[in-house]
C-alpha cells in the first residue's frame, strides 16, 4: 500500500489525498484523511507525499494561493506533488476548492502567490494553450464536449495544435476508447454521460499529454458507468499518463 501523508500547517484541513502508482489497484491505493471539520471555501495548506517516488517531480505545486474575487482566497497555501506514473486523487466536501485547484494548475484561475513547476520549469499562470503544448491536459466536470459536433470533430478540436498528426493521435485515443472509433460520426450531444466522459478524456489525450487533470469524471453517472470510467482512467495511466483527479469515489 502506498503511504500518503498530509502535513498540516496552519489552517484546518478540508481535503484528503489518495495516491496510487501505475500498477496499484483500488485496494492498493493509500489515502490520507484530513481533519473532519472542513474549512468551506478554502483549500488548506497541505503537502502531499505519495510513497517514496524516485526522481524529480513531474508537477510540483508549492503553497498556491488563488481565488476568483479580489481579496477572497479559495486556495490558501495548497501544495501538491505528482511524479511520473502516479495517480493522485483529491477528495473533500463541496466548496473546499478542489476544482479551483485543478483550474489553477491549468492556468484558468490566477495564482496570486506560490509556484507551479512542470519538470522543473516555472509554469505559474501560464496560459492553458501553452500548457497543452507542454503536455498538460484538462477535462472539466461539466460542459466538457461540443454537443453539436461529432465525436471525430470533438477529437479534432483536441488536436488543434497538431492537425497533421490527427490520424496517428486518433488511433492512439481509439486504442484506449475503442467505442469512439466505432461511433466517430455520432453527435456528441446524443451520447450518454459516460460516453461523453470518454469523448472529453479522448479529446484531452489527442496532444498525448504527460499530465491529465480530471475534475470529478464520475459525477452524475450510474454505478456501472462509474466503474467503466475508473477502468478507463487506469488504462490512461497505464498508457504513460500521470493523473491528478478530483473524485468523490477516489477509493475505486
Role assignments for model-derived ranges:
Residues 7-34:
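N-terminal intrinsically disordered, low-complexity tails
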Residues 3-4, 18, 35, 41-252:
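Glycine-rich phosphate-binding loops of nucleotide-dependent enzymes
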Amino acid at each position: 500500500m502506498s503511504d500518503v501523508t498530509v502535513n498540516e500547517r496552519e489552517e484546518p484541513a478540508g481535503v484528503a489525498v489518495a495516491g496510487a502508482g501505475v500498477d496499484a489497484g483500488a485496494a492498493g491505493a493509500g489515502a490520507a484523511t484530513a481533519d473532519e471539520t472542513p474549512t468551506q471555501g478554502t483549500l488548506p495548506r497541505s503537502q502531499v507525499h505519495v510513497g517514496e517516488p524516485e526522481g524529480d517531480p513531474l508537477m510540483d505545486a508549492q503553497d498556491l494561493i488563488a481565488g476568483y474575487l479580489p481579496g477572497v482566497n479559495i486556495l490558501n497555501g495548497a501544495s501538491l506533488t505528482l511524479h511520473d506514473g502516479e495517480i493522485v486523487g483529491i477528495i473533500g466536501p463541496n466548496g473546499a476548492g478542489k476544482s479551483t485547484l485543478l483550474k489553477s494548475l491549468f492556468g484558468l484561475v490566477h495564482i496570486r502567490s506560490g509556484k507551479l513547476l512542470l519538470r522543473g520549469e516555472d509554469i505559474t499562470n501560464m496560459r492553458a494553450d501553452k500548457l497543452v503544448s507542454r503536455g498538460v491536459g484538462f477535462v472539466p466536470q461539466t460542459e466538457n464536449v461540443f454537443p453539436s459536433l461529432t465525436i471525430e470533430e470533438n477529437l479534432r478540436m483536441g488536436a488543434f495544435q497538431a492537425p497533421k498528426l490527427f490520424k496517428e493521435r486518433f488511433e492512439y485515443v481509439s486504442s484506449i476508447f475503442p467505442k469512439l472509433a466505432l461511433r466517430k460520426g455520432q453527435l456528441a450531444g446524443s451520447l450518454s454521460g459516460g460516453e461523453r466522459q470518454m469523448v472529453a478524456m479522448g479529446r484531452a489525450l489527442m496532444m498525448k499529454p504527460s499530465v491529465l487533470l480530471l475534475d470529478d469524471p464520475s459525477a452524475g453517472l450510474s454505478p456501472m458507468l462509474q466503474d467503466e470510467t475508473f477502468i478507463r482512467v487506469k488504462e490512461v495511466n497505464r498508457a504513460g499518463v500521470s493523473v491528478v483527479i478530483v473524485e468523490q469515489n477516489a477509493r475505486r
